[in-house]
Amino acid sequence: MASTATQNASTRYSQIWIDQPASLPFQDSINLIKEDKEKWKKEKTAFLIDYDWFEGYVDFIYGEGDNPGPITQWRLLDEKNELKHSLEESIDYSIVSASLWHMLVEWFGLEGLAIERKVLLVGLAAEQKPFVDIYPINFTLHVLFDPINGENTSYSPLYQIDEPYHSDEPYAFSFSRSDTLRSLYKQVMEAFQISDGTSFRLWYLNKSNLSSRFVSLSEFNDQPAIALLSEYAVCMTIFEIDIADGSLLLEFQHPNGEWLSDSITKEQNLTINKEIGLCGLYNLGNSCYMNSALQCMIHTHELTKYFLSDSYEKDINYNNPLGMMGKVALSYASLLKMIHHTADMHSVSPSSFKFIIGEFNTYFSGYRQQDSQEFIAFFLDGLHEDLNRIQIKPYFERPDLFDEHPLHVQRVANQCWDIHTKRNDSIIVQLFQGMYKSTLECSICYQKSTAFDPFMYLTLPLPTSAKWRHKVVYVPPFGTQSPVELYLELLMESTVIQMKFQATEKLQKMGLECGELTACDIYRGKVYKVLKNKDKISKKIHKWDHVVLYGSTANGLTIPIVHGCKRPAMPGSYQSNDVFGFPLQLNVRSRNVLTNDLVKEIVELYRVYAGIDVAIGTLQLGLKRMESKAGKWECIKEIEVKRFEIVEEEEIVIDDKTVIMCLWNDQQYEKLFYNCEWIFEKIQFHMESITLEDCLLEFSKPEQLDLQDSWYCPGCKAFRPATKRLEIWRLPKILVIHLNRFSGHGGDLRRRRKRRDLVVYPVFDLNLKQFLSPFIKDHEWLSSQKSMLYDLYAVDNHHGFMSNGHYTAYARDASSQTFFKFDDTAICEIDPEDIVTSSAYVLFYRAKN
């Protein structure tokens, strides 16, 4: 179909116009316009009509305007009578059905050309949507030619055909986006009279400056963007391949089986052994969920090399009823090759790939945020079915197993895996698929039934009754004892009083008497809050909170000691000070204290607590009596904004409202405290609340099935309540772990709740041996494994809420072994220590062996 307007009106329509369409009543004309908005969508072709003229016609039949006169199309055409570029519907043109177009021309006449276009149906049969192919793809066709051996037999087909070949002008033609690559091959064969059986291939050049029909090898090599149109992709349409106007280069095979371009492409193909570069992906409207998943898949270098080396071509299963006609695999291969030939730190658009995915799953076809893990699951399954080497799946009876004799279990497991691989054989099975053991047990008679099922990824639950783990610091009331780090572990529903009780027990085992404890959350040198005994630790103590437990004694008076760095005082104002570090405490025996004695005790306190030797003459004290009725620790919540009076008296009076500040200048501050973790809050307080080990253990816990999921027990011969237990039986080379952070189901993402727990997972040496089913400890498959160790190489992260969140990815570059963060088009290096975050959603591990 040509890109020019297809009909000359003067040869088909009369140049007449009328005052009123006489062939239809007035109301029928209005109904005709309304019905036509849907009518053209059901036909094979439609016509473009000048928007202003058509609006004038609508006004005319409603009695709101004059007769529009003949249809004028000149505004849509250029000087070559071709459709102008960048025209827009409802601004420059309207779309009408063929029947309405012909009727309007008969009524009003036509000045200009009729512009007819194909109506394409995009998507699966049940979800197809009409799309008018306004701008067909225009190609120029060239022939790869060796000027040195121009007369040799490798190009004999070129010299056996008549025009249009003998002209030096490139052959120009247009193609509809709905036509397949097979149709394009056929049209090229017809244009050049190429006989069946002649081996040739087509190269696509996106940005071509070629003007001659013949293209030399050196010219071919100089082209900026070249892609081979694979004969394996003949089922895909031009729309799906996502190629635009450009040039096609025809290359014939030499009788000896060689291709002229191989002298160049062999050189280029060596780069396949080079790891794929760092390339960003453009966000196509909330497509970050896809981009993050793709970055993880792209950095699965075993799969990427499989595609870049074209090994996939021989495996494509076009006829698999469970597959996608090979299109998902072909589109992904095209995306990888585009990325592979893109310079590092640049970006590409995955638009064609996204369209193909949306064509087979409308859930991913729009511009709404979707679940990245669900995309990964669909994508892996689609790749597997497109690349399944089993053309006709044989039927097998599933073996039953009602006992747990180790030999029986192993025999049935082997049978199940053998059956699975006889029906499923693909690179996805080889890399990603493992198998788990599923055991049902009747709650009445305890009859068991065991089955073995393959998995592509493990969905791990986050324990609902996870342990609360935190590090706290105990500060004793006496200056003769150093602070102590305590590692506490309690149930999530525990309270602060229970936390104190566990801390007291640990201290007593160390031979330390702590008295009544005060629990404080310390932030930037002040008491941010004093924790109440009834407070739940999971709600009041957050992951990064610094919790300090202050001991007490019945003897004497204990006062807080805070640390301040002097700030220059403005004339006429009090000294202002910045507080830092953790408040300490000092026990004094008398309310009347000599300043010099107090300084000596504080100097000793610093030495014991922090290992700092301070010259007595360098320490300056500030004193403040708090007016608040609250306790002494509550009093220093706002300590950084209180003004302290410099102690100059020889003797001072201490009471339970007194707070002492030790004042340091900038030089002392840097010199004395730089390496002091107690003062500078360098202690790592947070401990993981959930580990990946916790999740794996939770995965294998027996689960009580709901009543609606009652199991038909072969022992009871009736439906019975049952428990179900899953155990890992066989591990894949690439282990994908989905951390199930979201609860709730259905399409409304706003109703899905997210857990933001930090799940701590190893970056190196994840050992899964302890999580395998105990029945395979002596199994030959296990003994054949060099190790059960896995290294992390990619993470799919979800930030924020499900309905308005954002996805990013961390991935390890295989050549440099460096981790990078991918945020759509933004790429930056990241330290391996920083990739364990509470945003981790899908983990990608690779077996070390």
UniProtKB/Swiss-Prot annotation:
A single GO CC term, please?
Answer: endoplasmic reticulum
- Tell me where in this chain the DUSP domain is found: 20-120
User: Where does the USP domain lie?
Assistant: 279-848
Mind telling me which InterPro entries this protein's record contains? DUSP-like_sf, Papain-like_cys_pep_sf, Pept_C19_DUSP, Peptidase_C19_UCH, Ub_carboxyl-term_hydrolase, USP_CS, USP_dom
Keyword NAD in record = no
Superkingdom of source: Eukaryota
List the Gene3D superfamilies hit by this protein, alphabetically.
Cysteine proteinases (3.90.70.10), DUSP-like (3.30.2230.10), Phosphatidylinositol 3-kinase Catalytic Subunit, Chain A, domain 1 (3.10.20.90)
Q: Which residues form a coiled coil?
A: none
Which keywords accompany this UniProt record?
Answer: Hydrolase, Protease, Thiol protease, Ubl conjugation pathway
Query: Which Pfam family, just one, is annotated for this protein?
Result: UCH
Please indicate if the UniProt record lists Membrane as a keyword: no
| MF terms in GO | cysteine-type deubiquitinase activity; metal-dependent deubiquitinase activity
Its recorded reaction(s) are: Thiol-dependent hydrolysis of ester, thioester, amide, peptide and isopeptide bonds formed by the C-terminal Gly of ubiquitin (a 76-residue protein attached to proteins as an intracellular targeting signal)
Enzyme Commission numbers on file: 3.4.19.12
Question: In its UniProt record, which GO terms are filed under biological process?
Answer: protein deubiquitination; proteolysis
Q: Which residues form the active site?
A: 288 (nucleophile), 806 (proton acceptor)
The entry assigns this protein to a family as follows: Belongs to the peptidase C19 family.
Q: What is this protein called?
A: Probable ubiquitin carboxyl-terminal hydrolase 1
> Which organism does this sequence originate in?
Schizosaccharomyces pombe (strain 972 / ATCC 24843) (Fission yeast)
What lineage is this protein's organism placed in? Answer: Eukaryota, Fungi, Dikarya, Ascomycota, Taphrinomycotina
